[in-house]
From Swiss-Prot:
This is Actin. Actins are highly conserved proteins that are involved in various types of cell motility and are ubiquitously expressed in all eukaryotic cells. Belongs to the actin family. InterPro entries: Actin (IPR004000), Actin/actin-like_CS (IPR020902), Actin_CS (IPR004001), ATPase_NBD (IPR043129). One of its GO terms (molecular function) is ATP binding. It holds the Pfam family Actin. GO terms for cellular component: actin cytoskeleton; cytoplasm. It comes from Eremothecium gossypii (strain ATCC 10895 / CBS 109.51 / FGSC 9923 / NRRL Y-1056) (Yeast). Keywords: ATP-binding, Cytoplasm, Cytoskeleton, Hydrolase, Nucleotide-binding.
Length: 376
């Protein structure tokens, strides 16, 4: 991209975190919680210039006096007014850019409803007046960021998990599987099992503490039963965690019991198959000729795949399910928390991509439905 051109903006809107930055960069400039907070009681902070809503980190830091809402549930936008606030915050407060001066690439969940893609397109062109726009499927971007065009992506974030097989750069829609089980459910489950230990976490603010415990101390056991026995016999896996008020709590087998739900959703009362079985099921829905390439390129992506031990466990479980001679390879890049964003940054800066954008002119001529003809 020559210096005369403006950098495109890449925004990966996740259920839990929004990642935003400039195409061509190797990491997002801004990463903040996808939350909008509103004061619980009007006028509680008289004279502090109280706003009627707060977004992202500011909402997080004032969470004690706010009611927090996530406009993206299970990867899908469910509250457009709040979503618009998040985008506004992204452009003006985080990136400090004028959206009417930059092309914008947004990401979407696999199998995002058509009406949602249209609504995103409409808001970008009509509310923010962007000059050009494109929307890409998250898992496909993750695969690009790993330097592949064929593989199967297990993308697990805060609100939803998808298994997406991709061949030569195109996702295979008939074999995409979704599990409504992700980071937020791990956090909820950890809250539940910690309360069984006598620790009480119930408010939205306390939930954030538990999320931190999860991110710092949880891991996936290679052999769950064996790990449970070890935990019962020794205190080797116990860790202590200091709460904001100074109280120190001890966490033992909860460290691996919470993430185990990814492999056995039944512990959460869910009927779904685990991430291992779902990955296998997705591969089996694909043509027999592409399966070998999928088994050899299982790419993990998203924050909920960051648990230590998850790749090894996945390798073990898939190998057990696959035909005995099959080579199974799990790719878990260290930057996988942001691989969707990184893939978007790569895509939006390719010279070949520049003719793919939906321009403002095309939008004005065709309306929001143009997104189905140009973005796939």
């Amino acid at each position: 991209m020559d210096s005369g051109e403006v950098a495109a903006l890449v925004i990966d809107n996740g259920s839990g975190m929004c990642k935003a930055g400039f195409a061509g960069d190797d990491a997002p400039r801004a990463v903040f919680p996808s939350i909008v907070g509103r004061p619980r009681h009007q006028g509680i902070m008289v004279g502090m210039g109280q706003k009627d809503s707060y977004v992202g980190d500011e909402a997080q830091s004032k969470r004690g006096i706010l009611t927090l809402r996530y406009p993206i549930e299970h990867g899908i936008v469910t509250n457009w007014d709040d979503m618009e606030k998040i985008w506004h915050h992204t452009f003006y407060n985080e990136l400090r850019v004028a959206p009417e001066e930059h092309p914008v690439l947004l990401t979407e969940a696999p199998m995002n409803p058509k009406s949602n893609r249209e609504k995103m397109t409409q808001i970008m062109f009509e509310t923010f007046n962007v000059p050009a726009f494109y929307v890409s499927i998250q898992a496909v971007l993750s695969l690009y960021s790993s330097g592949r065009t064929t593989g199967i992506v297990l993308d697990s974030g805060d609100g939803v998990t998808h298994v997406v097989p991709i061949y030569a750069g195109f996702s295979l829609p008939h074999a995409i599987l979704r599990i409504d089980l992700a980071g937020r459910d791990m956090t909820d489950y950890l809250m539940k099992i910690l309360s069984e230990r006598g620790y009480s976490f119930s408010t939205t603010a306390e939930r954030e503490i538990v999320r931190d415990i999860k991110e710092k101390l949880c891991y996936v056991a290679l052999d769950f039963e064996q790990e449970m026995q070890t935990a019962a016999q020794s205190s080797a896996i116990e860790k202590s965690y200091e709460l904001p008020d100074g109280q120190v709590i001890t966490i033992g087998n909860e460290r691996f019991r919470a993430p185990e739900a990814l492999f056995h959703p039944s512990v959460l009362g869910l009927e779904a198959a685990g991430i291992d079985q779902t990955t296998y099921n997705s591969i089996m829905k694909c043509d027999v000729d592409v399966r070998k390439e999928l088994y050899g390129n299982i790419v993990m992506s998203g924050g909920t795949t960051m648990f230590p031990g998850i790749a090894e466990r996945m390798q073990k479980e898939i190998t057990a399910l696959a035909p005995s001679s099959m080579k199974v390879k799990i790719i878990a890049p260290p930057e996988r928390k942001y691989s969707v964003w990184i893939g978007g940054s790569i895509l939006a800066s390719l010279t070949t991509f520049q003719q793919m954008w939906i321009s403002k002119q095309e939008y004005d001529e065709s309306g929001p439905s143009i997104v189905h003809h140009k973005c796939f």
